[in-house]
């Protein structure tokens, strides 16, 4: 299988962590795709140009970190991250959806902040900064929720990648104002799968 990524993509990092946690590293070739450029050869593989993108052994192509993670998790017939049925599963989906919303907003903020100053939209920067702070304030209050504790699950993986991405955004400071999140993130970052996939600093 071939997994196409961008080294700095938090969405690709989610899948890379699942690959490591599921001990699939020898079966999944990780390939850095050239994205956001004209006429990249990658567009012949994935016309959307997005990452992550998985080409399965049978040629099936999958896009979206949640879909790819679920596929990889079920390959051995013993899923580690599958959600339970009924109310517990609904609660996990609810929390994961809001965590992904946090990541989505930070991704917009990051892209905007990495533009040259004269190309940035102050309105977008303000809107996404305020959204991020609201959500991080919420998670600071709820970090002791059972889904953020105990055995590794998708909520923890996605949230760890979210906070890791937040660290890279210029002029966005969250650690000092969210000490519980800072402590949680430091513990999560010590996992080998997180250490191995730590994103590079933006150029």
Residue ranges and their predicted role:
Residues 73-77, 167, 171, 189, ...:
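Hydrophobic/aromatic-lined pockets within catalytic cores
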Residues 183-197:
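Charged phosphate-binding loop/patch that engages nucleotide di/tri-phosphates or the phosphate backbone
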């Amino acid at each position: 299988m071939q997994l196409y990524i961008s080294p700095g993509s938090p969405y690709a990092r989610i899948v890379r962590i699942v690959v490591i946690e599921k001990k699939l590293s020898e079966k999944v070739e990780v390939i850095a795709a050239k994205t956001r450029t004209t006429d990249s050869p990658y567009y012949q593989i994935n016309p959307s140009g997005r990452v992550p993108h998985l080409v399965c052994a049978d040629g099936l192509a999958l896009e979206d970190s949640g879909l790819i993670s679920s596929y990889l998790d079920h390959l051995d017939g013993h899923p580690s991250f599958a959600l339970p049925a009924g109310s517990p599963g609904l609660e996990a989906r609810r929390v994961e959806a809001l965590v992904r919303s946090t990541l989505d907003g930070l991704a917009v903020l990051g892209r905007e902040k990495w533009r040259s100053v004269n190309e940035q939209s102050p309105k977008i920067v303000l809107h996404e900064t305020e959204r991020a702070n609201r959500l991080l304030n919420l998670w600071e209050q709820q970090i002791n929720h059972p889904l953020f504790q105990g055995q590794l699950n998708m909520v923890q993986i996605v949230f760890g990648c979210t906070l890791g991405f937040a660290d890279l955004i210029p002029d966005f400071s969250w650690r000092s104002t969210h000490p519980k999140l800072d402590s949680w993130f430091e513990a999560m970052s010590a996992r080998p799968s997180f250490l191995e996939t730590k994103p590079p600093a933006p150029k």
